[in-house]
C-alpha cells in the first residue's frame, strides 16, 4: 500500500510540476507577445460646390481606397455640417448631406473629427443634423459589422468633453476632437468641443486631458486639434511646437492637427510624463514637486498640419500652371500619414514607424479626385499637367520629410 501511495504521490507531483511549467511558459509567451496597430491620418475632408456637385462621390477615394481599407483605423477631419434638412452650400458657410459622409466611410474612413471652425456654420440646426446623420450611419454600418467613430460634438449644451474609447484588436485607443477656432460665436458654439486659445483655455484643456487619461486607461491617446493660427503657412512656429509638447506631457500620444489647409512637417518627439504602469499617475511628493520616481520617457507623434485631403481650393482657374510655387497651390497636395505602433507583452514599445504617402487633388473631367502623388502617375499626364505636377512634386519633396521614419525600439 505504501508503494502504491508513493507512486500516486509521484504522479500527482509530476502533474503539478507539469502544470506549473506550462503556466510559466504561457506567462513567458504572454510577456513576449507582440501586437502592432496601424493608423492612417488624413487632412481636411472639405466640400466646395465642385465637390458636392459630383455625380459619383466614390471617385474621390478610388485611388486611395486600398490604403484606407488595409490599415486598422483611418482618421478624417470632416470640415462642414452634415445636415439633410438644409440645402447644400459652399464657402463661406458649408453644408453637405449624409451621402457625402457615407462616401467617406465607403472610401475607407473609420474615425471622424467634427470639431473645427466650420462645424457650426449652420448653427444649432446644422449640428443637430450632423449628430443625426452620423447616428443613422453608425446604426446602418453596425448591421454590417462595421464600426465607425467620431468626436467633437455635444448632444446638448453644457456637456463636458468626452473622449471616445475605441477598442481595436487588443488595443484601447482614446480619441478626442477639439477646436480652438470658431467662425460663429452664437449659442451653437456650446455644442462643440471648443477650447479657447488663451492661457486659461489651454490650461483647462491640459487638465481635462490629464483627467481623461487617468480615468480611462488606454494604450494610446489621440487628439485631433483644429488650431487657432493663420492659414496657408508652411513653417511651424516654436510656440506651436511648445504647445504640442505640453499636450504630450499631459497625456497625448498622437497630435493630429488641422486648419492651415497646407501640409506642415511632422516629427517623433521624446517627452517626459508622470506615469504608473503605463498610465498617468498625476501625484506629487507632498512638497509641491513631481515625484521623479514615476517620470517616464515617451515618444509621441506630432502632425503639425495635415493640409487638405479633398477640397475645391485648387481647381479650375485656381490652378496656376505658370506658377506652381504660388502659395495657394499647396492646398491641393497632402499626405496620408500611416503610424504603426507596437506593444510587447501588453506594454507600448518605443518603436514608432511613420510612413507618409504623398497624395494630390487632380481635376479630372468632373471634379477634383485624390490621386497617389508619384512620378509614375505624373508620367501619364498630358504635357502641360505633367510639367506642373512634376514641379509640385519637387516642391513637396523639398520641404517635407517624406521618407518613412522608424525610431529604434529602445531608448
Kindly label every feature range from the protein language model:
Residues 48-49, 82-85, 113, 119-131, ...:
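Active-site environment of divalent metal-dependent phosphoester hydrolases
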Residues 10-19:
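Bacterial N-terminal signal peptides
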Residues 108-111, 238-335:
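Conserved beta-sheet core of the metallophosphoesterase superfamily
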Residues 85-105, 219-251:
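Active-site-proximal segments of metal-dependent phosphoesterases and phosphodiesterases across multiple
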Residues 52-54, 58-62, 165-224, 242:
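Binuclear metal-dependent hydrolase catalytic cores centered on His/Asp/Glu-rich metal-binding motifs
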Residues 25-123, 130, 140-144, 150:
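N-terminal catalytic scaffold of extracellular/periplasmic and nuclease hydrolases
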Residues 32-36, 46-51, 216, 276, ...:
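A short C-terminal boundary segment appended to hydrolase-like catalytic domains
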Residues 71-83, 115-117, 209-234:
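Short acidic, glycine-rich surface-loop motifs adjacent to enzyme active sites
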Amino acid at each position: 500500500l505504501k508503494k502504491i501511495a508513493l507512486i500516486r504521490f509521484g504522479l500527482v507531483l509530476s502533474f503539478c510540476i507539469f502544470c506549473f511549467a506550462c503556466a510559466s511558459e504561457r506567462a513567458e509567451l504572454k510577456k513576449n507577445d507582440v501586437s502592432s496597430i496601424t493608423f492612417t491620418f488624413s487632412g481636411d475632408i472639405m466640400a466646395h460646390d465642385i465637390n458636392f456637385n459630383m455625380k459619383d462621390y466614390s471617385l474621390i477615394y478610388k485611388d486611395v481606397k486600398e490604403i484606407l481599407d488595409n490599415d486598422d483605423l483611418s482618421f478624417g477631419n470632416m470640415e462642414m455640417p452634415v445636415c439633410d434638412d438644409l440645402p447644400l452650400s459652399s464657402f463661406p458657410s458649408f453644408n453637405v448631406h449624409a451621402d457625402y459622409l457615407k462616401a467617406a466611410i465607403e472610401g475607407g474612413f473609420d474615425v471622424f473629427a467634427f470639431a473645427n471652425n466650420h462645424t457650426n456654420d449652420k448653427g444649432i440646426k446644422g449640428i443637430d443634423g450632423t449628430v443625426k446623420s452620423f447616428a443613422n450611419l453608425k446604426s446602418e454600418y453596425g448591421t454590417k459589422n462595421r464600426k465607425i467613430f467620431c468626436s467633437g460634438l455635444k448632444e446638448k449644451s453644457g456637456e463636458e468633453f468626452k473622449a471616445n474609447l475605441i477598442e481595436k484588436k487588443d488595443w484601447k485607443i482614446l480619441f478626442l476632437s477639439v477646436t480652438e477656432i470658431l467662425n460663429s460665436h452664437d449659442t451653437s458654439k456650446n455644442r462643440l468641443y471648443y477650447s479657447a486659445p488663451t492661457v486659461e483655455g489651454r490650461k483647462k484643456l491640459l487638465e481635462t486631458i490629464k483627467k481623461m487619461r487617468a480615468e480611462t486607461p488606454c494604450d494610446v491617446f489621440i487628439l485631433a486639434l483644429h488650431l487657432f493660427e493663420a492659414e496657408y503657412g508652411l513653417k511651424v512656429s516654436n510656440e506651436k511646437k511648445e504647445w504640442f509638447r505640453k499636450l504630450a506631457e499631459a497625456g497625448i500620444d498622437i497630435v493630429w492637427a488641422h486648419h492651415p489647409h497646407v501640409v506642415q512637417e511632422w516629427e517623433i518627439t521624446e517627452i517626459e510624463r508622470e506615469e504608473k504602469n503605463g498610465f498617468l499617475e498625476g501625484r506629487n511628493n507632498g512638497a509641491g514637486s513631481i515625484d521623479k520616481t514615476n517620470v517616464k520617457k515617451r515618444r509621441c507623434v506630432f502632425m503639425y498640419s495635415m493640409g487638405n485631403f479633398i477640397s475645391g481650393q485648387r481647381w479650375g482657374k485656381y490652378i496656376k500652371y505658370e506658377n506652381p510655387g504660388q502659395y495657394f497651390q499647396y492646398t491641393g497636395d497632402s499626405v496620408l500619414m500611416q503610424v504603426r505602433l507596437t506593444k510587447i507583452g501588453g506594454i507600448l514599445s518605443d518603436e514608432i514607424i511613420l510612413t507618409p504617402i504623398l497624395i494630390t487633388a487632380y481635376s479630372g473631367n468632373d471634379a477634383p479626385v485624390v490621386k497617389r502623388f508619384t512620378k509614375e502617375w505624373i508620367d501619364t499626364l498630358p504635357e502641360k499637367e505633367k510639367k506642373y505636377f512634376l514641379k509640385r512634386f519637387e516642391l513637396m519633396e523639398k520641404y517635407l520629410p517624406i521618407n518613412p521614419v522608424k525610431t529604434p525600439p529602445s531608448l
